[in-house]
Amino acid sequence: MDRVRILFLPGVDADNTNAQSLNVREIALRLDPGRFQSTLWYEHDPDPRLRDRPAIRLLKLPSHGKTWTIFREMLSGYDIIAYMDYSPASYLFLHLPHSARSPAQAVFHAEAPSAQFVNPSTVLRFLYGGTFPRCDVYTAITEFVARDVCNNIKKRVNFILPVGVDTKAFTPPAEREHDSPVVLFVGTVIERKGPQHLIDAAGRFPNAFFRIVGAGREGFSGVLRQRVEQSGLKNISLDGPKTQPEMLEIMRESDIFILPSRLEGIPKVTLEAAATGLPCIVFRDYETPSVIDGVTGFQAGTVEEIMQALERLIADPSLRGRMGAAARKHMEKFDWDFVSRQWQSAYLEIAAKPVR
């Protein structure tokens, strides 16, 4: 039987910490090489794990003409084009008649479609509206996100495919001993992700230390730095972006993980934090299965409930230990070696689906 040919659209450069890029690498590395041939893009230096793999083809994007390079490759007879985005190349491809793009099935992997509309850019809204509703197959990482797809682009989700974590790489430290508990936020430093709440928490809990890790956008890092300086707080730091190895060490050096964002799917950072044995605090708005409320952490409904959860964990090392151990155990069902089998089964079914 011929192998299923898949073109993944996210770039896989080694220094790319975007969640979609990280997910694509883990999936491609685990697809059965006897049944799949994966093609992936990079700009400068691809993840070294992807090199010299018999079933993985790496393509370097040129510095100019990227849209046409990607568009031409999309027309090269793939069975599946995975992780459809809202780039001009995807827009052009999806506006071709099915006969022109056959046999490719365009697959939209949904994380939280409504999150895209937070961006006020008219161009991005135009591209989003002209791409995602035209895909052939829809997957979602949770039931909540599947409902979001139905509500926002009026499409039925064909598969629920969670994302995973490498539990062999993300492991707890031998012990956690700090005079002051370390509370960690990891994510894009924008208002929607909620890092500003850590400044409020730092003022409320002076016996804990708070770390904000991640790249800033929309000038929000500067806003937060100004707030910290004006407050005179000494128990909080804004550490900027970090590499994956650095992130792992930071998680091992922390005691509590917090992501006060209202709009997510399965936040990858909660999987990584839980795998390193951290209890996690999140909002319950998006019903993430990565945190079991009261067992591996807390799902809160309000900012005040976030603060109450923090207060409990900061004050009780035993509770942190129990929840952290439960979080690590919970991550077994999110290990990429297990989760990738679901992706492989879905891709085989998608490839066998007749083109409309």
Language model regions located:
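A conserved mid-protein helix/loop that constitutes part of the nucleotide-sugar donor-binding site
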Residues: 19-26, 181, 185-204
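Aromatic "clamp/platform" in nucleotide-sugar-dependent glycosyltransferases that forms part
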Residues: 262
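Short hydrophobic beta-strand element within catalytic cores of glycosyltransferases
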Residues: 270, 279-282
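Short His-centered aromatic/hydrophobic patch
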Residues: 83-89, 110
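Glycosyltransferase donor-sugar binding loop
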Residues: 41-45, 165, 186, 209-223, ...
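Membrane-proximal helix-turn-helix segments that form the acceptor-binding/catalytic region
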Residues: 121-138
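Conserved acidic donor-binding segment of nucleotide-sugar-dependent glycosyltransferases
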Residues: 293-304, 312-317
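Short alpha-helical donor nucleotide-sugar binding micro-motif in glycosyltransferases
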Residues: 241-242, 249-254
